[in-house]
Amino acid sequence: MILETIGQLLIKVREENPLVHNITNVVVTNFTANGLLALGASPVMAYAKQEVADMAKIAGALVLNIGTLNEHEIEAMLIAGKSANQHGVPVLFDPVGAGATSYRTETSQRLAQELDLAFIRGNAAEVANVIGERWEIKGVDAKEAGGDVEDLARAAAKKLRTIVAITGKVDVISDGEKTYSIHNGHPILTKVTGTGCLLTSVMGAFAAIAKDKLIAGAAALVCYGVAAQLAAEKAAEVGPGSFQIEFLNALHNLTAEDVRRLGYIEKRE
């Protein structure tokens, strides 16, 4: 039943072509824009503090990503986020590398405190550090660490009063009450930079068109993971360069039937 709903949301994204405003990092800007276009959304990358408030209020969703943060982008994120909050636009936050440095951790916590976030998406270490728990970080990627990811997602969602998606070998998304685990995707995603960042923006596209934000987030995770599996069938053995191309193709060609056939989502207690 839920896979049927997810397939319908995929169709709706393409029908409505939502505008997703990204204040993201320099490493992933091109990949993020092309990924959103391939899916059927409309990306805009606007960073200047003089215009971000106006852009955010007309967007379907606002995505904030601190991968290559600096003081100018932080200011722009706060301006855009407050504008989005005032106009009912969902704000999604990707706390890239939270825990790697005090600057990243403090910035992540500040954004989470000062803005009304609809979603936070990160790996387990990033999410843990946003709520003040220590998980081991290497660069901006989390090592395998102890702790129950489902419990962490629930706790973070309750503490931050938002929907939290923790992605890894198994993806988990929770609003603090309802929790889903998603068992799609492919390991080669970790060999292409920006796949997590694009995922947050894809979640923005789904959040823009769905009333039930938790299901919207789960839908994005399932669709993204299924597209990765389809791309990996064609290119995983060739390498990450070919996979990146096939992944964009898979996002573009993904169907509701693919979702029903390959989607693997569980509701957790």
Curated annotation (Swiss-Prot):
Biochemical pathway: Cofactor biosynthesis; thiamine diphosphate biosynthesis; 4-methyl-5-(2-phosphoethyl)-thiazole from 5-(2-hydroxyethyl)-4-methylthiazole: step 1/1
Lineage, highest ranks first: Bacteria, Bacillati, Bacillota, Bacilli, Bacillales
Reactions that this protein is recorded to catalyse: 5-(2-hydroxyethyl)-4-methylthiazole + ATP = 4-methyl-5-(2-phosphooxyethyl)-thiazole + ADP + H(+)
Protein name: Hydroxyethylthiazole kinase
Entry keywords, A to Z: ATP-binding, Kinase, Magnesium, Metal-binding, Nucleotide-binding, Thiamine biosynthesis, Transferase
Protein family according to the UniProt entry: Belongs to the Thz kinase family.
This protein's record includes keyword Kinase: yes
Pfam families: HK
Annotated ATP binding sites: R121, T167
EC number, UniProt record: 2.7.1.50
Species this protein is from: Brevibacillus brevis (strain 47 / JCM 6285 / NBRC 100599)
Keyword Kinase: yes
Domain of life according to the entry: Bacteria
Entry cofactors: Mg(2+)
One MF term in the entry's GO annotations: magnesium ion binding
Alphabetized InterPro entries for the sequence: Hyethyz_kinase (IPR000417), Ribokinase-like (IPR029056)
